[in-house]
């Protein structure tokens, strides 16, 4: 499985492997709302999660442990759920583990250029 990199940014788009579990409940492409997506991305931790998935992913999807976030499990569960319910990420259940990836094609279809802005954003120190 080889990744393709979009020319405008270094967003990696990996093909979906065969035999994946069904995704958890999420909004359809036509149900994605800009205010909901931007609301989810307004949290710096969630914005960082999405950027890491877009720019550093070498696998199709990742568990929350891959991100190296020093947060309680309940907090991470909340943030990943917010991203999924906003339609930004797709999650699948693998036994006891949930793995996530960004819905690049869906978000590009609904909000062209949004993910390029997210990928190009440079975090500032507070």
Model-derived segments and spans:
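A short, conserved structural fragment
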Residues: 84-94
């Amino acid at each position: 499985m080889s990744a393709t990199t979009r020319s405008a940014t270094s967003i990696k788009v990996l093909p979906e492997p065969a035999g994946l579990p069904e995704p958890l409940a999420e909004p359809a492409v036509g149900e994605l709302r800009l205010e909901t997506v931007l609301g989810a991305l307004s949290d710096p931790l969630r914005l960082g999660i999405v950027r890491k998935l877009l720019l550093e992913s070498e696998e199709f999807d990742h568990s929350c442990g891959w991100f190296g976030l020093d947060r309680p499990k309940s907090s991470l569960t909340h943030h990943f759920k917010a991203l999924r319910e906003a339609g930004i990420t797709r999650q699948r259940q693998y036994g006891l583990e949930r793995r996530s990836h960004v819905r690049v094609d869906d978000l590009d279809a609904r909000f062209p250029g949004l993910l390029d802005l997210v990928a190009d954003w440079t975090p500032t120190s507070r």
